[in-house]
């Protein structure tokens, strides 16, 4: 099995911490499954030290961009990925494999005044909806977040 983990948000605060801990503990627990870490060019050495079953693959599309909607699925095809784990709420509808997604919260939808404009709100809401409907499993952090996901999706 070849699992891709989207690690492009490695340096973000909450999601970055989640990704770093996920990789740290997966490396301790699983030495057999092949993991592809989709990362930014500056993080190409991300897999070093995790184990021989971890490999970094550069994914240059920016998170939350229109480009990732096309480039990410294409990268998954090129890498023959079996399962994608998205550690944030964006899961392009054209993803060619099974997928799981982590949705930490819906704060950006609950407080849209902190987004740059209405288009950003619509994009965020559409991406959350697609991710929730498309993913085989959703990981979340609490019953409150679960209730919010159900409300917005």
What are the residue ranges of the model-derived segments?
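Carbohydrate transferase catalytic cores enriched for Leloir-type hexosyltransferases
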Residues: 1-153
């Amino acid at each position: 099995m070849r699992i891709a983990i989207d690690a492009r948000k490695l340096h973000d605060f909450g999601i970055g911490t989640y990704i770093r801990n996920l990789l740290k503990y997966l490396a301790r627990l699983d030495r057999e499954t092949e993991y592809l870490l989709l990362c930014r060019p500056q993080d190409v050495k991300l897999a070093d030290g995790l184990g021989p079953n971890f490999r970094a693959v550069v994914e240059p599309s920016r998170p939350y961009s229109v480009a990732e909607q096309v480039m990410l699925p294409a990268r998954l095809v090129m890498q023959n990925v079996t399962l994608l784990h998205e550690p944030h709420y964006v899961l392009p509808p054209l993803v060619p494999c099974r997928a799981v997604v982590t949705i930490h919260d819906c704060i950006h939808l609950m407080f849209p005044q902190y987004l740059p404009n209405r288009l950003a709100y619509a994009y965020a809401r559409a991406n959350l909806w697609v991710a929730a409907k498309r993913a085989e499993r959703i990981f979340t952090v609490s019953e409150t977040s679960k209730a919010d996901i159900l409300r917005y999706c």
